[in-house]
Every structure is written in structure tokens, then in C-alpha cells.
Amino acid sequence: MNEKIAVVTDSTTYLPDEVKEQLRINVVPLSVIIDGKSYREGEELSTADFYKKVKEAENFPTSSQPAPGEFIQLFEKLKEQGFDTVISIHLSSGISGTFQNAASAGELIDGLNVVAYDSELSCMAQGMFAVKAAEMALANEPLERIISELDKIKKAQDAYFMVDDLNNLQRGGRLNGAQALVGSLLQIKPILHFNDKQIVLFEKVRTQKKALKRIEDILEVAIKNKNAEKAYVIHGNDPEKGETWRKHLESKFPEVEFELSYFGPVIGTHLGEGALGLTWSIK
């Protein structure tokens, strides 16, 4: 008899509600703390409200990971629902303890096989893993095959972000060293990416136009190497800017399927408003 597999992820995937419902993806929220008040991302605070509150806040917002107890509660519930296995997919362990908390909680549940999976990224890059795992679980694919597919996606996947300034990342402790200093220089648009699970500075580019062009050049190489079949443009509270770039990319690279996503509160805390990102992988 096939094992019954559930898929769990966290709120930083920013998956559309209909996708979560259709694919039965369980979501554990991270929280954002604004002026001493904690909000569960996606439940107590929408993305639009977050950016509005940040503008009015006295202090710089921070984020916090879900406690192991939240995972224990969910895993127990899934076990009661008859699941044998849980694949718990989370944002990079290099920027958050969420993955570790899921893994620790999983070890405490008797009679349930919890496989914690480190996406090594975040946002819709992480969401791609959750969607693939959930589609395969619903098709009754075995655990080994699902993990093997996730590993293939990980091998092909990449993500680059352009931010307006690096101060948020520096204050949030998510950027190595004194790299934030470059952001204060006139017109510098830093391009960031994930390297060894951390957010690091990839390149310093003079203008937004040049930064986006540089990311497009990297995508072009990935397409030639057969590593980019589906991509997401990710925006920081500027859907128009995101959609404009998505349409441009769609016409430039018709062989790739492009969709629009966003940086929600937790990731927005670190990247700031106006950030733009692009992530891609195989389907």
C-alpha cells in the first residue's frame, strides 16, 4: 500500500491561496514584529498592511520563526488524519531557524516520518519545491521519487534580487560583513543572490535598468543550459513594476513560462520596498 504523504511549508513561499487549497499544502506562518507587536504572516497581517505599517513604525521591523510547538501541533494533526509521511519544506536554514525547528519537531512525533527539506532559498523559489512535492504526493508518487525530483529542481534553480538599498538586510543581520556600505552610494543597485544558503552581494550595478539586464543575461545562460523552464518575477509591493518586467521577459524568452509573485512581510522586512527578484528552475 502506498504511503500517505502530506506537504508542509512556511508562509515565506507566498503561494496563492487557491494553489495551497488545490494542492492541500499546509502552511506554518512566520511572524513579523512591528513596534513590539507580533503578527502572524498571512493570517494577522496582509502584505499591503505590512508595508503601510512599516512606513508609520517607529522602529525597524524584525521577523521570528515558528516555535517547534507549532510544528508539533500540525504534525500530530496530520498523523491523526492518517498521513504516514510529511515532507516539510522551508526557507534557507542560512537565514532562519525554521527548517531546524521543523526537523526537531519531526523527531518528537512517534509513528510519523517527517522529512525536513531545506530549500536553501525563499519566496517562490521555495514555493516551487512545495508545489512539485504536493503535485507528486497527490499523484501517489513514493517519497524517494519526490525527494529526487526536488533535488533536480534545486540543482537547476537560481534566484537573483535587486534591492533599492542594503540597509534593511544589514540591520536585520541577513547580509555578511560591511557589504551594505555600497548601497548608500549614489545610484548603486546591488544585485544579491543565495550562495551556500546565505544572502550575499553578487554584483554592484549602476542603475536599475543595468541591474535587470544583468539578471536577464544570467537567465539567458540558464536557458541555454536547460535549467530554466519556469520562472517567477517577485516584487516588493510594486505589482506594476513586477508585471512590466514579467511581460518584457515573456516576449524576450518565449520558451520560458513566467509568473508574478511577491515579497511578503517576513522577506520584505529584509529586502525593503521596491525590491525585484527573479527565480527559475526546471518544471
From Swiss-Prot:
Residue ranges constituting the DegV domain according to the UniProt record: 5-282
Listed SUPFAM superfamilies: DAK1/DegV-like (SSF82549)
Gene3D superfamilies the record matches: 3.30.1180.10, 3.40.50.10170
Superkingdom to which the source organism belongs: Bacteria
Entry's Gene Ontology molecular function annotations: lipid binding
Keywords: Lipid-binding
Annotated hexadecanoate binding sites: S63, S96
Function, as annotated: May bind long-chain fatty acids, such as palmitate, and may play a role in lipid transport or fatty acid metabolism.
Protein name as catalogued: DegV domain-containing protein lin2658
Organism (species): Listeria innocua serovar 6a (strain ATCC BAA-680 / CLIP 11262)
